Swiss-Prot record:
Pfam families: NusB. The lineage of its organism: Bacteria, Pseudomonadati, Pseudomonadota, Betaproteobacteria, Burkholderiales. Residues 1-36 are annotated as: Disordered. It comes from the Bacteria. It comes from Albidiferax ferrireducens (strain ATCC BAA-621 / DSM 15236 / T118). This is Transcription antitermination protein NusB.
Length: 177
C-alpha cells in the first residue's frame, strides 16, 4: 500500500461547513427564502417611497423589473408594499412611542425595515414573531447603518408583546423554564 502524500501545513485552511452565511454573518443570496427576497425588494420599494416620493404603482413596476425579482414571493412583496404604504401613518403611530428620536433622524432604511416588521407582526400572523424580528435584523445588517440592526431589534422587540402578546409570552415562558 502506498501512503498518501501529506500536504505541507499551512498550505490551505481546513474546509468549513457550508452554513449559508457569509464571513460577515449575512446570508448568501442562494440560501435566502422566497419571502426573505420579497422583504428585500419591499425594503427597496419602501425606501424609494420614503426618499423619492414616487407613486406606489411606479415603484412596483420598477421593482418587478429588477434582477432576481422572479425568485421572490411576489404575493408577500405585494402585501408588504401595499400594506406598509397604505398604513404608513398607523405603523408610525405604533413605532413612535418606542423611539428615542424623531423619524426625521432615523435612516430611511431603518424606518422602512421597522415598517416591514410592524406590518408583519400586526398582519402576517402565519410568520412567527421571532422570524419577523430575525428577518428585520438581517435586513438591517445587510442594508442599514453600522449599528442599525441593534436599534431595529430593540424597537421591534419592544413592539412585539403589544401585537402578539400570547405568542411572545408563550415563547418567552419556554426559554425561562
Amino acid at each position: 500500500m502506498t501512503e498518501q502524500p501529506t500536504k505541507p501545513t499551512g498550505s490551505r485552511p481546513p474546509r468549513q461547513p457550508r452554513t449559508g452565511l457569509t464571513s460577515t454573518g449575512a446570508r448568501k443570496a442562494g440560501s435566502k427564502s422566497d419571502r426573505s427576497r420579497a422583504r428585500e425588494f419591499a425594503l427597496q420599494a419602501l425606501y424609494q417611497s420614503l426618499v423619492g416620493k414616487n407613486t406606489v404603482s411606479d415603484i412596483d413596476a420598477f421593482t418587478r423589473d429588477l434582477a432576481g425579482f422572479s425568485k421572490a414571493d411576489s404575493l408577500h412583496f405585494d402585501t408588504l408594499l401595499q400594506g406598509c404604504t397604505e398604513q404608513a401613518a398607523a405603523l408610525d403611530a405604533l413605532l413612535l412611542p418606542l423611539l428615542d428620536r424623531k423619524f426625521a433622524e432615523i435612516s430611511p432604511i431603518e424606518h422602512s425595515i421597522m415598517w416591514i416588521g410592524a406590518f408583519e407582526l400586526q398582519h402576517c400572523l402565519d410568520v412567527p414573531w421571532r422570524v419577523v424580528l430575525n428577518e428585520c435584523v438581517e435586513l438591517a445588517k445587510e442594508f442599514g447603518g453600522t449599528d442599525g440592526h441593534k436599534y431595529v431589534n430593540a424597537v421591534l422587540n419592544s413592539l412585539a408583546p403589544s401585537l402578539r402578546a400570547a405568542e411572545v409570552n408563550a415563547d418567552r415562558g419556554k426559554t425561562r423554564a
